[in-house]
Design a protein with these regions (language model features):
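Alpha-helical scaffolding within the catalytic cores
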Residues: 49-55, 122-125, 158-159, 221-224, ...
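CE4/NodB-like, metal-dependent polysaccharide N-deacetylase domain
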Residues: 154-175, 203-207
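Short, acidic/polar
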Residues: 87-100, 151-165, 221-228, 307-310
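Beta/alpha (TIM)-barrel catalytic core signal, keyed to glycine-rich beta->alpha loops juxtaposed to Asp/Glu
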Residues: 179-382, 386-389
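Structural motif corresponding to the early beta-alpha repeats
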Residues: 131-152, 177-180
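N-terminal binding-site loop/beta-alpha segment at the start of enzyme catalytic domains
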Residues: 2-136, 169, 200, 206
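Structural preference for beta-strand elements that scaffold enzyme active sites
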Residues: 64-68, 108, 135-139, 170-173, ...
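Conserved, mostly hydrophobic/aromatic
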Residues: 57, 69, 109, 124, ...
Length: 393
């Protein structure tokens, strides 16, 4: 249901919000600055170590945990997320998070050369290298966003550096990162086709140094459709898409450039391509909802966290191989383990309930910010996503 106020806050109203929220920013109360989202997570209880839900990759028979660890937000020594902070990554805490995750059956870890300001792969590699190589699947990306990395030589150098940082001699899941961004197909061709990089990656898969090759999709639907139209040629092993109970039917109401997850998932499903799910919480917004929505969710399932509803939605589709969550803090990991150990799939009535919830969320006069931070840094020193997220709350 469209909300015109949602899209068209007038300049005066926005500046009022900006000024008020900027004051809160200085007091370090903003979710974009530091937020453990404590209200979304229940107290720690015993979590079984042998009840993780797994899915089978049809092309490789990999037995993949339905909860995947997104490594974009590793904690820093200042107890912030390394996505936002330049402080040193707290490797000891990263190791502990990985230990708890693996002990409870998580075996899929998703990183990128771009994550944590270029430090995620190294921290992830240090933590995982303490385990036998067959205990985990590592997913990383060819994140050649900058034109300076579009040459064949620069892109291949980035690819080889991932092996070094991750301390591995093969990559389980390699993604073309963020296809559809920027100028759509023109940019995709410059990054992967005109320079011969996709041909190189296909050869690497043939040689066994890449076990599964896919892409993560953002933005221009023409690129998504084009790549699937060439599936017989490229034989995509998986595709990473944004899927949550708002984007399922209302993606364009959140961001006009987005496409409904119902369509994206459906196109993958009819081709038998496994889906990897990103943004199950819509940039954290589905774990930090309006108080009225929180009460509604708690009334239906009092013992469950607000976030668990979104994760159960994403995990309930049979074509989903794993659902990614960027877990900075132990309480986030613990809550997600409760959700997936094992997963309690949604009923049809539950899905209808969440569709009603999505429509209610869209009626609130919010600004469509996913905390991606592509608008940062601000030349005036403002925490733009923090301000917008504070307004939304």
């Amino acid at each position: 249901m469209k909300n015109e106020h949602n899209k068209n806050l007038d300049r005066r109203d926005f500046l009022k919000v900006l000024g008020g929220a900027a004051a809160v920013t200085s007091a370090t109360l903003l979710p974009g600055c530091k937020n453990k989202q404590e209200s979304a997570y229940t107290a720690t209880t015993d979590i079984p170590t042998d009840q993780m839900t797994y899915r089978i990759n049809p092309s490789t028979q990999d037995r993949v945990s339905l909860l995947g660890y997104g490594c974009m937000r590793w904690p820093t020594v200042s107890n912030n997320s390394a996505r936002d902070s330049s402080d040193d990554i707290d490797q000891e805490t990263v190791n502990k998070l990985v230990d708890v995750a693996i002990a409870h059956g998580v075996n899929y870890f998703d990183t990128s050369p771009a994550y944590c300001k270029g430090r995620s792969e190294r921290a992830t590699g240090i933590a995982l290298s303490r385990y036998p190589r067959d205990k985990y699947f590592i997913a990383t990306k060819l994140s050649n966003f900058a034109p300076s990395t579009w040459s064949r030589e620069a892109s291949i150098a980035m690819y080889h550096n991932s092996f070094k940082e991750l301390q591995v001699n093969y990559i389980d899941y390699l993604l073309l990162h963020g296809v559809g961004m920027g100028n759509g197909l023109q940019e995709f061709n410059a990054r992967y086709i005109d320079n011969g990089v996709l041909d190189f990656l296909l050869a690497e898969r043939q040689a066994g140094r890449i076990r599964n090759l896919g892409f993560s999709y953002h933005g221009d639907i023409k690129v998504f459709d084009y790549l699937l139209s060439r599936h017989d040629e490229f034989k995509w092993d998986f595709v990473q898409i944004q899927l949550n109970y708002v984007d399922w039917k209302h993606a364009k109401e959140v961001n006009e450039r987005n496409t409904n997850a119902e369509y994206l998932y459906g196109e993958l499903s009819k081709r038998g391509i496994p889906a990897i799910i990103m943004e199950p919480l819509l940039g954290g917004r589905l774990s930090n909802v309006h108080d009225h929505i929180t009460a509604k969710l708690k009334q239906r399932k009092p013992e469950s966290s607000v976030a668990s509803w979104a994760f159960r939605f994403a995990g309930s589709f049979p074509g989903v191989l794993t659902v990614l969550s960027g877990m900075t803090y132990m309480e986030h990991l613990q809550d997600n383990l409760r959700t997936f150990c094992p997963l309690d799939p949604l009923s049809d009535a539950d899905k209808e309930f969440l569709e009603e919830t999505a429509q209610q969320l869209l009626r609130y006069p919010t600004i469509p910010c996913n905390d991606c931070k592509y608008c940062m840094p601000c030349p005036y020193g403002l925490d733009i996503p923090g301000i917008l997220l504070h307004f939304n709350k």
